[in-house]
From Swiss-Prot:
Keywords, comma-separated and alphabetical: Methylation, Ribonucleoprotein, Ribosomal protein, RNA-binding, rRNA-binding
Organism: Buchnera aphidicola subsp. Cinara cedri (strain Cc)
Protein name: Large ribosomal subunit protein uL3
PTM notes: Methylated by PrmB.
Intrachain S-S bonds: none
Molecular functions per Gene Ontology: rRNA binding; structural constituent of ribosome
Record-level GO BP terms: translation
PROSITE patterns, sorted: RIBOSOMAL_L3
Length: 208
């Protein structure tokens, strides 16, 4: 299903007449330009390739610059591909605006979560801590046993342990659209979304 690419601006709050408020995330969605249309005949699958924003030519790889030049599209800040079943309805150079979400109520949003470095099991997996007193020495945040005995004799793959937290591609589903500002090209989404301020965000109509 086709979606759009936006940039996370940050979070704010919207107030209502009933003296209530909700937290919202502001996402800037500039016009998305279709770069390449992939078809079953040429590529064995259907999708469209989009770009948005602007990037200086000297900061673009020659191969990437040649790709934009081939389809006669101005250089954007990146390339994103969305699989779809009706790619023939689009053409290179076509603009897709924020009004694409005009009649849609909920979105699935994908981004790269904030990296938090090396984290223990309490922070990474929400493990409970061990006793604070009663003879506990230096084992307040340790995970405990990670295996069994001589059989099986190894730690199972996927065992929840300490390690790198964050900086992963993450999707949050069914986020409600609060407001669409087509003049400033900003969409307000209820709640928080993955990613740091200024990061690229993928927005798709909700599949649920």
């Amino acid at each position: 299903m086709i979606g759009l690419v936006g940039k996370k601006l940050g979070m704010t709050r919207i107030f209502f007449e009933e003296y209530t408020s909700i937290p919202v995330t502001a996402i800037e969605i500039l016009d998305n330009i279709v770069v390449q249309v992939k078809t079953i005949e040429n590529d064995n699958y259907e999708s469209i390739q989009l770009t948005t924003g602007f990037k200086k030519e000297k900061k673009v790889l020659k191969s990437e610059y040649g790709h934009f030049l081939k389809f006669n599209v101005s250089v954007g800040r990146g390339l994103w591909e969305f699989k779809c079943k009706n790619s023939s309805n689009y053409s290179s150079g076509q603009k897709i605006t924020i009004n694409f979400f005009k009649n849609i109520k909920k979105l699935d949003i994908t981004g790269i979560s904030k990296g938090k470095g090396f984290a223990g099991t309490v922070k990474r997996w929400n493990f409970r801590m061990q006793d604070a007193t009663h003879g506990n020495s230096l084992s307040h945040r340790v995970p405990g046993s990670i295996g069994q005995n001589q059989t099986p004799g190894h730690v199972f793959k996927g065992k929840k342990m300490s390690g790198h937290l964050g900086d992963q591609r993450t999707t949050i589903q069914n986020l409600k659209i609060v407001k669409i500002d087509d003049i400033n090209k900003i969409i307000l989404i209820k709640g928080s979304i993955p990613g740091s301020i200024g990061s690229d965000i993928l927005l798709k109509p909700s599949i649920k």
